[in-house]
Amino acid sequence: MEDLIFVTAQPDVPYFHWQVRIYVHNFIQKGINPNNIHVISGMVNGNKEPTLESLELKKLGINIHHYLDNRHKKYYIPNIKPFLVYKWLEQYPQFGKLFFLHDADIIFRELPDFNSLIKDKTIYVSDTIGYIGYNYIMDCCNRYEKQYPNSPKQQLITDMSDVVGVSINKIKENQNNSGGGQYLIKNSDYHIWQKIYMDCVPLYDTMMNYHKKYPIGAPIQFWTAEMWSLLWNLWYFNFDVKVSEKLSFSWATDNNFIYEKHTILHMAGVTEDLKHSKFYKGEYINVNPLEKLKENPNQFDYVDKNSSTINYINIMKDLIEKEV
């Protein structure tokens, strides 16, 4: 595992600066060498230089990489991730051999058994089958077609698969390996990530245009276009991809009983109506929760002790204690 590097890619904005600090603290706690942590930041909103806050993260002993956000189309925000990975591997091709690509809003309850996952050429991913698998897409197709019985059958999945260049059969056969979120990537290069990036917006546009033509109340999740582009392009380039239980994650909406069953906590899912008993990161887009906690040690006392998010709060508290 000493060769494994840990990578996130996101805009250089305050919302991600504090998230990086928290997961880096957690990773180091779990024994990960800070030199194996790489943060790829996109200089956005017309900025031509890295922010001071982003440069400050170097003091954690981690690797920070900055690239100008010169994506062709920026209205689909998630495509910045594959864009930045593409730019990073273009500059540092040696890192394409093996890396764990993860979201910035995760922590490890315990380290996954990476040693058992890095021995072969298979790319291992977390289980997101429920919202990007073949069955999910077909459920969406059926909802659209039920409301519009004269519409072409399976048009949505056909148009989506045509964007990337994979067959519907390929997607169907890999229903049980339709994962994402966190990826143990092996033997990739910048050409692959360039295509992943380039296919994101066409996928997003394809879904949006279909929905505009056939609007329904419960549409397909447009925001996961980047996840489909990443997964399907791995198949396009003939990678073996498998969902691994060792990379399973709990959500921020879960309780501690569920949290204890997974190696990873993904701090997503909490909405504004749940913020009175769980940590809601949407309130901290422009505010640093670490600073709030420094000012008031009781800042997050409202968080339910049985909420998985209490574990995130505890890491924040530990980080602040270590800094003092």
Spans of model-derived segments:
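N-terminal anchoring/stem segment of glycosyltransferases
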Residues: M1-I77, W88-G96
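GT-A fold catalytic core of metal-dependent nucleotide-sugar glycosyltransferases
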Residues: N79-C140
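C-terminal catalytic/acceptor-binding lobe
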Residues: G217, Q221, V241-V324
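Substrate-binding rim/cap in mid-to-C-terminal beta-strand-loop elements of soluble/periplasmic
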Residues: Y136-Y148, P152, G179-S188
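A structural signal for well-ordered alpha-helical segments within the folded catalytic domains
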Residues: W18-R21, N79-Y86, T224-W232
